[in-house]
Amino acid sequence: KAYEIWSIKPPLQRARIIFKFKEVIEKNFEELAKLIVSEHGKVFEDAKGSLTRGLEVVEFACGIPQMLKGDFTENVGTNIDSWSIRQPLGVCAGITPFNFPAMVPMWMFPMAIACGNTFILKPSEKDPSCPLRLAELFKEAGLPDGVFNVVNGDKEVVDAILENKDIPAVSFVGSTPIAKYIYENGAKNEKRVQALGGAKNHCVVMPDCDLDQAVNGLMGAAYGSAGERCMAQSVAVAVGNIGDELVHQISKKLETLKVGPGMDKTSEMGPLVTKEHLEKVRGYVDLGVKEGAKLVVDGRDIKLQGYENGYYIGGCLFDQVTKDMRIYKEEIFGPVLSVVRVKDFDEAVKLINDHEFGNGTSVYTRDGDVGRTFASKIKIG
């Protein structure tokens, strides 16, 4: 019933409600950020940054309803004209991960709703409070009941979404195994499926680079949000003779990286999301040692006074990692950076292209030709 009403609402009226939603989010911005910190654990500045990224999509969605125009072609055949119109799909669904409980949902539902669809959001069971609050704020902005719905649960709820014939489209962000599961079962039930899986993202560090810039970039890319993001650069590829100095500079930075509770203004990295995830990340560090990688910085046993039972781990740094090791092949999803050494640029490109997956990559160099060649040869994204 909600779809029947919302799908025929004039575009300008939809746009006004979404614009009001944007204003309501801005009014409650700090409250939402604190919800993320309290439930997920990321530091306050990271929480605010992720909210801002999501809000940008809401702002963009405000203009979408009036851009949905059809086409007309005259006389495509004898006395035949052709019209095409753009119609909503219906009830769409989104399944989102724990690491960005506001930003990733806001990539999905504002755009779908702007186009006249209704939406079911299944957030992570680890931190659902912010999505639930967003639903309340959307209603406060004037969205009719039933247009945006949040359902909590685990695999049982996911399967119900995938099997429901009244849901024609599903979006997913999360791990690669579950992305494959979503694709397989969604396609089996004739749904449109959009799924973003996990990754192992590389950063190539060339001998001619500005090393300070590379190290500062890697500190944010590898350890920001405690490494709990699909775009985290968890592999640094050291080309030529740059490896020793790169490892030395990163290890020095890690010595002063402040780990602590998210609302502490001095904290640069917060805890991991759950005890189970902490044990998983620690297990990967244990595995790296067994596999023969050199653990240069070990953050496994970090202790914070007053937070002894918190899910904290310090930044970890491995050197002499090889492509046959599991810590290189698999997504750790924690503050762990692996340094792989290669002899030249071509070997670096081959290493990245041979990896099973990757959402993004980068190169630090002063040579414009190297940057251009890198962009054209890399098969990532």
Which stretches of residues belong to each language-model region?
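ALDH superfamily catalytic-core signature
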Residues: 177-322, 344, 351, 378
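A structural signal for short, well-ordered beta-strand elements
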Residues: 7-8, 40, 150, 207, ...
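Long amphipathic alpha-helix in the N-terminal Rossmann-like dinucleotide-binding domain
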Residues: 19-30, 42-68
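Rossmann-like NAD(P) dinucleotide-binding subdomain of oxidoreductase/dehydrogenase enzymes
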Residues: 70-213, 342, 365
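Residue-level signal for inorganic ion chemistry
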Residues: 14, 36, 58, 116, ...
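Residues at or immediately preceding the N-termini of alpha-helices
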Residues: 11, 29, 44, 211, ...
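Conserved C-terminal structural/oligomerization subdomain of aldehyde/semialdehyde dehydrogenase
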Residues: 167, 204, 258, 308-381
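N-terminal alpha-helical segment of soluble enzymes
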Residues: 1-44, 241
